[in-house]
């Protein structure tokens, strides 16, 4: 958020998102959609999808969570279809979306604890994993987003 502030793009980005414009946030691009982030210090997010970004709670985990992991769909839609359920995607992260409404979670993943891996509000999507590094399933997700958003 500090870099977005330095670049003076927080206001235009919020205006863009408030118009329910199409957006796909990847990793940190998803995390900035939250209300608050708790990395080095408490930081206000864009507040588009209510919730907080906090570090994994399980101290026994290897952090960052790096590698392939399965997503489990809560519900599908035009972009995130049933074809992605139980498929592996590539993750690299230490922080997760918490205190989020279930209605905003399209998919979750388990890594020591259950966490949202795909979130949505209107035309705004966020994915915690890296679809660009996730082989055919990731490319399929990006293709769906481009063609259907």
PLM features: what roles do these ranges have?
Residues 8, 75, 137:
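Short, conserved clusters of charged catalytic residues that mark active-site
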Residues 124-149:
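Acyltransferase
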């Amino acid at each position: 958020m500090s870099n977005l502030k330095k670049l003076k793009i927080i206001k235009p980005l919020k205006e863009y998102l408030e118009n329910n414009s199409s957006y796909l946030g990847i990793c940190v691009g998803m995390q900035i959609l939250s209300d608050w982030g708790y990395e080095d210090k408490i930081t206000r997010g864009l507040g588009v999808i209510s919730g907080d970004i906090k570090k994994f709670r399980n101290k026994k985990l290897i952090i960052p969570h790096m590698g392939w992991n399965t997503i489990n769909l809560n519900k599908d839609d035009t972009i995130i279809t049933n074809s992605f359920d139980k498929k592996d995607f590539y993750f690299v992260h230490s922080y997760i979306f918490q205190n989020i409404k279930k209605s905003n979670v399209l998919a979750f993943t388990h890594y020591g604890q259950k966490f949202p891996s795909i979130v949505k509000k209107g035309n705004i999507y966020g994915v915690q994993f890296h679809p660009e590094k996730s082989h055919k399933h990731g490319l399929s997700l990006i293709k769906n987003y481009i063609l259907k958003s």
